[in-house]
């Protein structure tokens, strides 16, 4: 099927969301990028937004409703583990629905806010939207001084730069393993660290002057 790559991408993206959520602690949920600035979503609000936004896009744009018209898109108790369980369940149902769709379904135009776009186009935008917010949460983990497992490739905690052949180390091998591990209090893969190697492209260097932008090497995280 021509659009199988979108289904496969969603299947891996949902795991990445859950993996990043699993890196937080319960006490992190109220944390914002700047404590006194309400413009930046807290960790809690990012989880709420992911559940609500994805439900709305799938239901109103793609025609896939797994939450009963939005009635059950949030967990009854808004804790870290309950958000993980809710998103794992709902995104799994969405994945099953996507796997049943044929090419004409993907190519049909639907309403995307105030314009018409194909469902395939909408799905690309949905994946990008999710990735954007996941990146914000990964930045929050660094602000909190936490370790980060792989999301797309190496991170500073899995070995540093891809150019130095740092390994990719995922927190869990599957959604099922993630749920089981987090219910036991956490059972993530061990992180090797960088063993003294550089973990960023310009370690220890002063910021470049305005107008100067040297090319970057393939990096991490």
Regions found by a protein language model. Name each.
Residues 10, 14, 21, 87, ...:
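Hydrophobic alpha-helical core bundles mediating ligand binding, dimerization, or RNAP-core interactions
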Residues 99-113:
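Acidic catalytic patch
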Residues 1-8, 78-84, 124-127:
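Active-site rim elements
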Residues 7-18, 29-73, 111-178, 182-206:
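Short, contiguous alpha-helical
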Residues 64-101:
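Helix-adjacent hinge/juxtasegments
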Residues 214-221:
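A cross-taxon signal for low-complexity, glycine/charged-rich
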